[in-house]
Swiss-Prot record:
[4Fe-4S] cluster binds at C439, C445, C485, C489. Pathway: Sulfur metabolism; hydrogen sulfide biosynthesis; hydrogen sulfide from sulfite (NADPH route): step 1/1. Its EC number is 1.8.1.2. This is Sulfite reductase [NADPH] hemoprotein beta-component.
Length: 576
């Protein structure tokens, strides 16, 4: 017990240093209200000022600008073209055709880019929404039963759930838990409704029994996972519930805590980290455990240094066993030994699959998740046309793809015809392309150091050429991911080849992840150009083609061959 008291003393005292300014901001925000309403009325600037720049994140938005034209606007003595990106809250990524048509219409009429972006957080984003349209955006979403509460900021964000329409009953159970967890951990403040939906201003204390008056030290991510699929990448998340079934019925979850991929260039105290397995809990204790993990991180997390504020660093600082014991105490539960499970795949099953209920599901590969009408490939229009006739729902995936789910047999041919006519089914897409992914990066992300989404398609074509040069069959491909900065949205730190942006045209080159997403890769080359990277890939793939063991993946080969050392304990090994 004294150890726990000591931990609390350290974490609530001054030993970690003075509080970060974000803590003042949250404390003074009037429960996330700030002066956002006043900023909305200010037409002199297209942006949000002072603290509101940060506070709008708790409402699901980031202030951005078009970096392609930033310098030109500066020459003309104009401020950057400020706009916001909104990320919707959609636990499990399920959206109805009616909802889809509404967001498609808004993107077309009220965003600068006219696109919808599916993201690794299993939801959609609007990019390029100007200040006069922000309130309309929230009201449009509210009218169709969607919001963006807590999809950014120091809160529990959009809860992911394995997209597995084949095992329909189990998926439905898991999805319902994803929704319950999301609702349970949401902020209780009425600020969102008051500001965006003209909700009645109530005299209320806005008590936050789980998140607390200062909310969490840093962002917090949660998943619900149905083995053997790991499409949500459990080790990228703070809290994971691994579904354990008995005779097809969900009986409980194995709980994994403390994953996360973000780091800071040049700071060896930051690193990607896998989640720790705490053990099994029955269904009835799920919400208590979720709240206990969140409140322990709330109370023990580092509020002095935001670079070390995530759950993964709390576990490494206080000890995983100490953190686990506190969760047990708060939840009133004893973790049982984890039930057996295996994660073997994480790609989406592109094409048609039939569920156990006889319904059909069409997974569409959407490169980098960008739905736009390209010349000869009107992808965005194609999905809208499907939505006009589809009787089931759509499921966004954490791989940035889209599943047309619940298609009856008699409608299958018609849906496929629409998809093919609009380029949504393209038989020329290689398995390598389907297993490659990038975050948004330029021109909209203010944190991007290098290109990602715009860089990936042509670079994948070059990787395809390398694989062909070394006579590798289609099924022998590489999990390849690019992220424009070390914050990790593209989940490159769980790839067999992961590129992390360092500067325009330059990346840190990581090797050694595996196909199932259960190993963190290690830096192989630092700050090199894309041409140098391609040369290295050519050499490494050449070796893999000749020297590999039977069925040995590229990432496994790089470890066995000693090209990079395996990262077993991130704090010790990642920077070693």
């Amino acid at each position: 017990m004294s150890e726990l008291i000591d931990v609390k003393t350290i974490l609530s005292g001054t030993e970690l240093g003075p509080l970060a300014d974000n803590e003042r901001l949250k404390r003074e925000s009037k429960h996330l209200r700030g002066t956002i309403v006043e900023d909305l009325q200010d037409r002199i600037t297209g942006g949000f000022t002072k603290d509101n720049f940060q506070l709008i994140r708790f409402h699901g938005m980031y202030q951005q600008d078009d970096r392609d034209i930033r310098a030109e606007r500066a020459k003309q003595k104009l401020e950057p073209l400020h706009n916001v990106m909104l990320r919707a809250r959609m636990p499990g990524g399920i959206i109805t055709p009616k909802q889809w048509l509404a967001i498609d219409k808004f993107a077309e009429e009220h965003t600068s880019y006219g696109s919808l972006r599916l993201t690794t957080r299993q939801t959609f984003q609007f990019h390029g929404v100007l200040k006069p349209n922000i309130k309309l955006m929230h009201q449009t979403l509210n009218s169709i039963g969607i919001d963006s509460i807590a999809t950014a900021g120091d809160v529990n964000r959009n809860v992911l759930c394995t997209t597995n329409p084949v095992e329909s009953e189990l998926h439905q159970e898991a999805y319902e838990w994803a929704k319950k967890i999301s609702e349970h951990l949401l902020p209780k403040t009425r600020a969102y409704a008051e500001i965006w939906l003209d909700g009645e201003k109530l005299e209320t204390t806005d008590e936050e029994p789980i998140l607390g008056s200062n909310y969490l030290p840093r962002k917090f991510k949660t998943t619900v996972v149905i083995p053997p699929q790991n499409d949500v990448d459990v080790h990228a998340n703070d809290l994971n519930f691994i579904a354990i079934a008995d005779n097809g019925k969900l009986v409980g979850f194995n709980v994994l805590v403390g994953g996360g991929l973000a780091m800071t260039h040049g700071d060896t105290a930051t690193y990607p980290r896998k989640a720790d397995d705490f053990g099994f809990v029955p269904l009835k204790k799920t919400l208590e455990v979720a709240a206990a993990v969140v409140t322990t991180q709330r109370d023990w997390g580092n509020r002095s240094n935001r670079k070390n504020a995530k759950t993964k660093y709390t576990l490494d600082r206080v000890g995983s066993d100490v953190f686990k014991a506190e969760v047990e105490k708060r939840a009133g539960v004893q973790f049982e030994e984890s039930r057996p499970y295996e994660l073997t795949e994480r790609g989406d099953r592109i094409g048609w699959v039939e569920g156990i209920d006889g319904k059909h599901h069409l997974a569409l590969f959407i490169e980098n998740g960008r739905l736009l009408d390209y010349p000869g490939k009107p992808l965005k229009t194609g999905v809208a046309e499907i939505a006009k006739v589809h009787q089931g729902d759509f499921r966004m995936t954490a791989n940035q793809n889209l599943i047309v789910a619940g298609v009856p047999s008699e409608q299958k041919d018609h849906i496929e015809q629409i998809a093919r006519a609009h380029g949504l089914i393209d038989d020329t897409h290689s398995e390598q392309r389907k297993n490659s992914m990038a975050c948004v990066a330029f021109p909209t992300c203010p944190l991007a150091m290098a290109e990602a989404e715009r860089f990936l398609p042509e670079f994948v074509t070059e990787i395809e050429g390398v694989l062909k040069k070394h006579n590798l069959p289609e099924e022998d491909n590489i999990i390849f991911r690019v992220t424009g900065c070390p914050n990790g949205c593209g989940r490159a730190m769980l790839a067999e080849i992961g590129l992390v942006g360092k500067a325009p045209g330059r990346y840190n080159f990581h090797l050694g992840g595996n196909r199932s997403g259960t190993r963190v890769p290690k830096m192989y080359k630092e700050n090199i150009t894309d041409r140098q990277i391609l040369t290295e890939i050519d050499h490494l793939v050449g070796r893999w083609a000749i020297e590999r063991n039977e069925n040995e993946g590229f990432g496994d080969f790089t470890i066995r061959a000693g090209i990079v050392d395996e990262v077993k304990v991130s704090k010790r090994d990642f920077h070693a």
